[in-house]
Amino acid sequence: MVEKTILEAVKKVVEESPKRNFSESVDLAINLKNLDMNQPKNRVDEEVILPHGLGKELKIGVFAKGDVGLKAKAAGAAYVISDVELEELAADKNRARVLANECDLFIAETQFMPIIGKNLGIVLGPRGKMPIPLMPNKDVGELIQSKQNAVKLRSKDRLTFHVAVGRRDMNPEDLAENIETIMSRLERVLDKGKHNLRTVYVTTTMGKSERVV
C-alpha cells in the first residue's frame, strides 16, 4: 500500500501537466540540508532497483567477446563491443563519445576494465558511465535484466540532484511505489535520515511539480 500523499502528488502531476507528443520522464528533485557535501562520506551514491522499472528499455553497451558477447546480445544489449572494436574506439574518441551518449550504461568483462580505464576513462568517467564489472561467476543476461530496472542516486558534491522514477504513461500506483523505494533508500543512507531532506518534488520533464516532502 503506497503512501497516500505520494500517490496524490503523482496523480496531480500526471493529470495536470500539459499533454505532450512524447512520453515524458517522471523525476524526483531532491534537496538535502545540514550536510557538508565537501565531505565524501555525506555524498549520495547508491544504485536502487525500482520495483516497476523506468517504463522504457535502457540502452546497455557490453564490452565482451565469445560466448559472453553472444549471451549479452541475446539478453537485449544494444551494443556488444569486442576487444577489436574496443581498440578502434580507443583510437577514435569522437566515435567513443557518440557511443557513450547513446548508451544509458555499460557492462564489461573484467579483463576489459584496465584497457577501458586507460583509453576510454576520459570519455566515460565524466558521464558517470564507467562499466559495471562482470565477474566471472556472474551471468551477463541476469545482470542486464537487473540493470534495466535500476537507477543511480548520485548527488556528487551538490545538495540538489534529480533521479528518474519512470514515465508519465505508467500506472500512478507503480510510479508512487518506485518513489517510495527511492525515499526509503535515501532515509537509510543519509546521516540523519529524513531530517536531511529539505524538500522532495515529483515532476515531469516539461510539466508541473508537486512537493512530497
Curated annotation (Swiss-Prot):
GO molecular-function term, one example from the UniProt record: rRNA binding
* Biological processes, Gene Ontology terms: regulation of translation; translation
Keyword Endoplasmic reticulum (UniProt)? no
- This protein's source sits in the domain of life called Archaea
Gene3D superfamilies referenced in this protein's UniProt entry, alphabetically: 3.30.190.20, 3.40.50.790
Could you tell me which SUPFAM superfamilies the record lists for this protein?
A: Ribosomal protein L1 (SSF56808)
Per its UniProt record, what InterPro entries does this chain match? Ribosomal_uL1, Ribosomal_uL1-like, Ribosomal_uL1/biogenesis, Ribosomal_uL1_3-a/b-sand, Ribosomal_uL1_arc, Ribosomal_uL1_CS
Give the UniProt entry's GO cellular component terms: large ribosomal subunit
Q: Which UniProt keywords apply?
A: Repressor, Ribonucleoprotein, Ribosomal protein, RNA-binding, rRNA-binding, Translation regulation, tRNA-binding
Transmembrane residue ranges: none
Family note:
Belongs to the universal ribosomal protein uL1 family.
Q: What does this protein do?
A: Binds directly to 23S rRNA. Probably involved in E site tRNA release.
How does this chain assemble?
Answer: Part of the 50S ribosomal subunit.
Protein name, per record: Large ribosomal subunit protein uL1
Gene name linked to the record: rpl1
